[in-house]
């Protein structure tokens, strides 16, 4: 992926310098896990029940957009179960032996966390199925006619799989998870709580309005909120007395080109191109990519999802259309009623 995409300030994917920082502010207990009330309540019940029965927790699938706390929840599950945690990711497991090495080193009730589980090699999945269902590992010894299969018993364990692309999971793998949790984007009050908690851990002085200003521009994502907090902290220490209030947060985020709706330069460039160069659309993805000098995949996977979710653009069979919200955001007059009606007649054909 393009370096400028990876280091995008309001990008939800983890950046190279962030794992240690995220660990330092990651909650360890469900009681400290902010937001996702339904998920938190359900997991509390499931964990308590499994603990009372002295059983391993059912296998858990966690899915949702990046930056919402899937890894954090996996760590909390292990901590609440008073179990060990082994962590890996789908692309890392290249051979069946890689998975076998992990499984045979698990202790009873341990948690095996596989991030990006949708990227598992199909051959790895085949090895995983009996391990999940029967806590057994089938290993092939030897090659050719002399090859034979032996079964190894595994201790009862919990697989926690995390993915941003649940639709890419194969049905056999998806069906083996007894617990499936979807993480939603966070509400502003929850993000304010998250910002204030992180500020306390980082010894940053921040008031309610300062936390609110950061939360409103965080695109519903805790990882982005924590990243913006660190950048606003830098600004406050250099340009102010180190304390973050609403005006300091606003000035810092404006300087960083993150506007009140969490849009950055790339978002605004795409939206303004649709409005000014293509009269609000519809415009095909290839034409749009050429107009803003970005790859099609970058637009579809990185820029568009948040804009579609927030209602700034619509995808139709004839192309992308800027909505009324986009015109309002840029304080631009709406197109003529006939043009607007023609565009919005496509609403019934949204992809």
Curated annotation (Swiss-Prot):
Q: Which GO terms describe its cellular component?
A: cytoplasm; Holliday junction resolvase complex
Q: Enzyme group, top EC level?
A: hydrolase
User: Binding of DNA: at which residues?
Assistant: 296, 315, 320
Subcellular location(s) per record: Cytoplasm
Q: Which GO terms describe its molecular function?
A: ATP binding; ATP hydrolysis activity; four-way junction DNA binding; four-way junction helicase activity
Keywords assigned by UniProt?
A: ATP-binding, Cytoplasm, DNA damage, DNA recombination, DNA repair, DNA-binding, Hydrolase, Nucleotide-binding
Q: Biological process GO terms, please?
A: DNA recombination; DNA repair
List the catalysed reactions.
Answer: ATP + H2O = ADP + phosphate + H(+)
Could you tell me which residues belong to the region Large ATPase domain (RuvB-L)? 1-186
Cystine residue pairs: none
Major localization listed first in the record, in broad terms: cytoplasm
Keyword Cytoplasm (UniProt): yes
| Residues involved in ATP binding | 25-26, 67, 70-72, 133-135, 176, 186, 223
Q: Where is this region: Small ATPAse domain (RuvB-S)?
A: 187-257
Gene3D superfamilies in UniProt = 1.10.8.60, P-loop containing nucleotide triphosphate hydrolases, Winged helix-like DNA-binding domain superfamily/Winged helix DNA-binding domain
Q: Which residues bind Mg(2+)?
A: 71
Where are the residues of the annotated region Head domain (RuvB-H)?
260-351
In short, the EC number is 3.6.4.-
Assembly and interaction partners: Homohexamer. Forms an RuvA(8)-RuvB(12)-Holliday junction (HJ) complex. HJ DNA is sandwiched between 2 RuvA tetramers; dsDNA enters through RuvA and exits via RuvB. An RuvB hexamer assembles on each DNA strand where it exits the tetramer. Each RuvB hexamer is contacted by two RuvA subunits (via domain III) on 2 adjacent RuvB subunits; this complex drives branch migration. In the full resolvosome a probable DNA-RuvA(4)-RuvB(12)-RuvC(2) complex forms which resolves the HJ.
The family line of this record is:
Belongs to the RuvB family.
Provide the function of this protein. The RuvA-RuvB-RuvC complex processes Holliday junction (HJ) DNA during genetic recombination and DNA repair, while the RuvA-RuvB complex plays an important role in the rescue of blocked DNA replication forks via replication fork reversal (RFR). RuvA specifically binds to HJ cruciform DNA, conferring on it an open structure. The RuvB hexamer acts as an ATP-dependent pump, pulling dsDNA into and through the RuvAB complex. RuvB forms 2 homohexamers on either side of HJ DNA bound by 1 or 2 RuvA tetramers; 4 subunits per hexamer contact DNA at a time.
Domain comment as written in the entry: Has 3 domains, the large (RuvB-L) and small ATPase (RuvB-S) domains and the C-terminal head (RuvB-H) domain. The head domain binds DNA, while the ATPase domains jointly bind ATP, ADP or are empty depending on the state of the subunit in the translocation cycle. During a single DNA translocation step the structure of each domain remains the same, but their relative positions change.
Descriptive protein name: Holliday junction branch migration complex subunit RuvB
Q: Which organism is it from?
A: Coxiella burnetii (strain RSA 493 / Nine Mile phase I)
State the encoding gene: ruvB
């Amino acid at each position: 992926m393009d370096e400028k995409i990876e280091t995008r300030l309001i990008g939800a994917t983890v950046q190279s310098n962030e794992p240690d920082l995220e660990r330092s502010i990651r909650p360890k207990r469900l009681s400290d896990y902010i937001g996702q009330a339904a998920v938190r309540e359900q997991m509390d019940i499931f964990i308590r029940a499994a603990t009372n029965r002295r059983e391993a927790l059912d296998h858990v699938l966690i899915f949702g957009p990046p930056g919402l706390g899937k890894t954090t929840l996996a760590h909390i599950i292990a901590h609440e179960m008073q179990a060990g945690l082994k962590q890996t990711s789908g692309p890392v497991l290249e051979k069946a032996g890689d998975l076998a090495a992990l499984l045979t080193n698990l202790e009873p009730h341990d948690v095996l966390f596989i991030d990006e589980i949708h990227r598992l090699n199909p051959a790895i999945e085949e090895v995983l199925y009996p391990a999940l269902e029967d806590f057994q590992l089938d290993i092939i010894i030897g090659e050719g006619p002399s090859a034979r299969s032996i079964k190894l018993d595994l201790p009862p364990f919990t697989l926690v799989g995390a993915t941003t692309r649940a639709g890419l999971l194969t049905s056999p793998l998806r069906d083996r998870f007894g617990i499936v949790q979807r993480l939603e984007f966070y509400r502003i009050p929850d993000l304010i709580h998250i910002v204030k908690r992180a500020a306390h851990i980082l010894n940053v002085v921040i008031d309610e309005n300062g936390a609110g200003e950061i939360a409103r521009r965080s695109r519903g994502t805790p990882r982005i909120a924590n990243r913006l907090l660190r950048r606003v902290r830098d600004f406050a220490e250099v340009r102010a007395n180190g304390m973050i209030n609403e005006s300091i947060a606003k000035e810092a985020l404006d300087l960083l080109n993150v506007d009140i709706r969490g849009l950055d330069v790339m978002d605004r460039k795409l939206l303004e191109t649709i409005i000014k160069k293509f009269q609000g659309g519809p415009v095909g993805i290839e034409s749009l990519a050429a107009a803003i000098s970005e790859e099609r995949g970058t637009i579809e996977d990185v820029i568009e999802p948040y804009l579609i979710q927030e209602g700034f653009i619509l995808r139709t069979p004839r192309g992308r259309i800027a909505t009324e919200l986009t015109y309002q955001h840029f304080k631009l007059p709406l197109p003529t009623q006939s043009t607007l009606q023609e565009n919005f007649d496509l609403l019934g054909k949204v992809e």
